[in-house]
Regions:
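Bacterial N-terminal signal peptides that target proteins for export
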Residues: 1-11
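Lipid interaction determinants
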Residues: 22-115, 119-182
């Protein structure tokens, strides 16, 4: 417990020292008109469960080396223009020493997890959505525009994005498949 308290305290001190702007809950978040009142928006709203994370490289589609064959996660779009997504590799090793990971265990935990929350905009005619992370595991993504093309078919949603793989920096097309939670 003491180590967990130290990490939590260090995290909040770092936020204060870096003067990270607070996200005020009572301030309205700007929502793009493209996000509201469209048939596509109505179809995207709700909670989605992760089915698969694959990569396309050189015409081949392979399971993501970072998230594995059986990833877990959720994606949520709400009617106020907010998105929250978390995905993880279910085979990440547990830490042998409880709350204190070895460097390899910490690396595996970080590279096998992805998550952020923020705003989103839908560009229905062009079949893409843009996520604007406000809180993100990857600090460099905060404030960026993350474009994902989408395909909707019934209760299935496929998001695609060209991105760098966290583990080795190579550019790949990520294909993330979701199913609607009912």
């Amino acid at each position: 417990m003491r180590v967990h308290f130290r990490w939590t305290t260090a995290y909040f001190i770092a936020l204060l020292l870096l003067q990270v702007p607070a996200i005020e809950a009572d301030q309205p978040t700007p929502v793009s008109p493209s996000t509201q009142n469209t048939p596509i928006a109505a179809q995207l709203l709700g909670t989605w469960r992760l089915v698969a994370v694959t990569e396309e490289e050189g015409g081949r589609v392979i399971p993501s080396p970072d998230y594995g064959l059986h990833p877990a996660g959720y994606l949520m779009y709400d009617s106020t223009g907010h998105v929250c997504v978390q995905l993880m590799n279910t085979t990440r090793p547990k830490w042998k020493d409880g709350d204190v990971p070895t460097p390899d265990e910490a690396r595996s935990a970080i590279l096998g997890f992805g998550g952020y929350c923020g705003r989103y905009e839908i560009h229905a005619a062009e079949h893409y959505v843009v996520h604007f992370p406000e809180a993100d595991l990857w600090p460099n993504d905060i404030g960026q525009a993350l474009k994902r093309t989408f395909e909707l078919s019934g209760d299935r949603l496929v998001l695609k994005a060209v991105e760098r793989r966290p583990s080795d920096g190579r550019l790949t097309t990520n294909i993330i498949t979701w199913t609607r939670v009912k």
